[in-house]
């Protein structure tokens, strides 16, 4: 599974475990040398060490690398020695490299800094890899969410006093058009997962009314799907695996674009949206961006980044509306770009809105409801 999800990723590969473990002794020696010259030494082992204590530090780290992060945190509570050992930055950097491609979602509060893994350990001497891992991993985020139910209940109650209208979401992006399996068609034909709630009467010129669905058979929400061009042009581009001309956006000049992944900044066209889409942006409560996450294709992420920024422009509506990014592939077993890498490529950390990147596939709609639930929570509806 790891090799499948990590294909196309610079932080993954079938030889990752072997490479890290083969070099752990050399890296550990360098780190210990730096520690002796820059800070206090870790506390000595207990006076009557168990067999595990008598092993070389490199062997201890190798054994610890086989444990789960939860087990490590529990081991750190045994005594001062193990508390220091389980905080070893090399160990937690290894966990980040190993587990990050497998995470199915990441949000604006948990995205790890790309510099954590792109720079050497000595360059990141001040970084707390353990804290970065525990902040980013889905299990920790789930525990944090479950520990704040009162706030969610209060905001949901207050919102119900103000408005009863179903939330409206604008959905756009290349994943709607480039995949061999149509996400929208699957949504329309999955009544057990997404029951249809009808077509609203509120029309938007040139766009229509969108389609309403039930979430958990209780909460209604409306999706306005924004395609880049006509069906014929989209199909032609999909068959040729090329990008169709996007007629939702109008070039406005040039803007500095962060190169990402260590590349230097470059000049790129900035965009505005056409009048019909501008009307949509003023009315919706949030956005769904469907990214093509198939690793086999080439993607112009910098262009996508500029288009996302144009769509969520604060001048077109209330600030802070949530953005759900669906990292979508056609089939569940396809090689995909991990959601953390996709978030970095789209430069989502530069946005001033709450966002979530969620793995999904068009065939089974896996992850779609989790993303909708997140939007409802951000809007105070749950």
Predicted segments, located by residue:
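CRL adaptor-proximal regions
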Residues: 1-54, 99, 107, 112
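Eukaryotic intrinsically disordered and solvent-exposed regulatory patches
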Residues: 47-50, 68-69, 144, 154-159, ...
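Short hydrophobic alpha-helical "box" of cullin-RING ligase substrate receptors
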Residues: 51-68, 72-86, 92, 96
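Charged, amphipathic alpha-helical linker segments immediately N-terminal to NTP-binding catalytic cores
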Residues: 95-145
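Conserved G1/Walker A P-loop phosphate-binding module
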Residues: 142, 152-197
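Switch I (effector-binding) loop of TRAFAC-class P-loop GTPase G-domains
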Residues: 188-238
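Inter-motif core of Ras-like GTPase G domains
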Residues: 240-264, 270-295
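Conserved GTP-binding G-domain of TRAFAC-class P-loop NTPases and closely related GTPase folds
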Residues: 283-382
């Amino acid at each position: 599974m790891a090799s499948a999800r990590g294909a196309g990723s610079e932080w993954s590969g079938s030889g990752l475990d072997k490479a890290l473990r083969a070099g752990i002794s050399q890296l550990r020696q360098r780190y210990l040398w730096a520690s002796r010259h820059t800070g206090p030494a870790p506390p000595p082992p207990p006076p009557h060490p168990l067999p595990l204590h008598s092993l070389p530090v490199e062997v201890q780290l190798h054994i610890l690398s086989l444990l789960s992060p939860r087990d490590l945190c529990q081991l750190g509570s045994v005594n001062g020695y193990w508390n220091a050992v389980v905080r070893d930055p090399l160990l937690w950097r290894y966990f980040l490299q190993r587990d990050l491609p497998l995470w199915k979602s990441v949000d604006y509060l948990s995205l790890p800094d790309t510099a954590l893994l792109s720079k050497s350990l000595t360059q990141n001497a001040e970084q707390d890899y353990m804290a970065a891992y525990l902040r980013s991993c889905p299990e920790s985020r789930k525990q944090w969410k479950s520990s704040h139910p009162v706030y969610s209940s209060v905001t949901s109650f207050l919102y119900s006093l103000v408005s009863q209208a179903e939330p409206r979401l604008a959905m756009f992006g290349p994943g709607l058009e480039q995949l061999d399996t149509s996400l929208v068609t699957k949504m329309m034909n999955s009544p057990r997962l997404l029951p249809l709630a009808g077509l609203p009467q509120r029309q938007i010129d040139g766009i229509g009314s969108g389609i309403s669905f039930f979430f958990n058979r209780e909460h209604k929400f409306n999706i306005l799907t924004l395609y880049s061009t006509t069906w014929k042009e989209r199909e032609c581009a999909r068959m040729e695996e090329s990008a169709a001309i996007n007629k939702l956006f109008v070039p406005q000049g040039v803007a500095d674009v962060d190169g990402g992944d260590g590349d230097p900044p470059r000049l790129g066209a900035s965009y505005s949206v056409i009048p019909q889409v501008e009307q949509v942006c003023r009315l919706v409560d949030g956005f769904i961006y469907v990214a093509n996450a198939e690793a086999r294709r080439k993607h112009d992420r910098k262009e996508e980044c500029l288009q996302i920024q144009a769509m969520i422009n604060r001048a077109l509506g209330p600030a802070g509306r949530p953005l759900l990014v669906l990292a979508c592939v056609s089939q569940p077993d396809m090689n995909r770009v991990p959601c953390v890498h996709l978030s970095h490529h789209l430069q989502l950390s530069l946005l001033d809105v709450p966002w979530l990147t969620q793995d999904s596939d068009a065939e089974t709609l896996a992850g779609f409801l989790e993303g909708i639930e997140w939007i409802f929570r951000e809007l105070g509806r749950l």
